[in-house]
Amino acid sequence: MSAAAVLDGLNPRQREAAAFGIGAEGGAPPPLLVVAGAGSGKTKTLSHRVANLLLHGADPGRILLLTFTRRAAAEMIRRAEAIVAAAMAAGGAATAPTVEWAGTFHAVGARLLREWAPVIGLDPAFSILDRSDAEDLLDLVRGDLGLAKGKARFPKKGTCLAIYSNAVNAQNPLGEVLASHFPWCREWEAELRRLFRAYVEAKQRQAVLDYDDLLLWWARMLEEEGIARAVGDRFDHVLIDEYQDTNALQAAIVLRMKPEGSGVTAVGDDAQ
């Protein structure tokens, strides 16, 4: 089975997207944005694009696949590797290559942060708080500041974390976040600022990161030109599924890694 034959099961538009810029001379393909609706085969197309890259000699260790769930990443890589394995078996080749970097933004961020931790001032052995643990820590800080006593209308821990997360991921000022999404909490802006500062300090003391920190630290380390270049040069191809769900922080991460867009493929649905 040839690389071209791998695309036979796709319709013309899917085939065009799966093959775009691959095999052309001049290095990594130009940036590609695929906009398609539900049920149009976006995942199938992206899986075939990964397979097509591998069959054209792309280094599997230099492909980065970013998704929004671990299950989506695993399924996409399973499909791509099955396609490649079938093609290689038909040609009498050996074991198919394995894509080494695939997962959610948070999982990939955690992996990179552990590698770069000594350079950026993080403890490489940092622990990761899930949402429940983050809420509990925020609630402890809230209590220490006296914001949980005698303030019946002060936001509960889940709401506080939602406000904090929105501000971090959207990269918007707290006042704007409150006005746009939590107007009933606007009267507590000063107290929330104090709470969030203390929450950040508590995480630093305990050497823990919450999910938002995984993106925030990743984005911040890429503000250093040398680090951004090193991380960006590590990957020839960056493929992003469900791009319409990316937030400002995630978009900034991709842009800082690949400022020219070289080798970037983004797939999304503009109706969602």
Each language-model region and where it sits:
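Conserved helicase NTPase motor core
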Residues: 3, 8-35, 45, 64-65, ...
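Conserved P-loop NTPase-based nucleic-acid remodeling module centered on helicase motor cores
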Residues: 60-162
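Generic alpha-helical structural context detector
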Residues: 19, 107-110, 114, 162-166, ...
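Histidine-centered active-site/metal-ligand motif
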Residues: 48, 106, 237
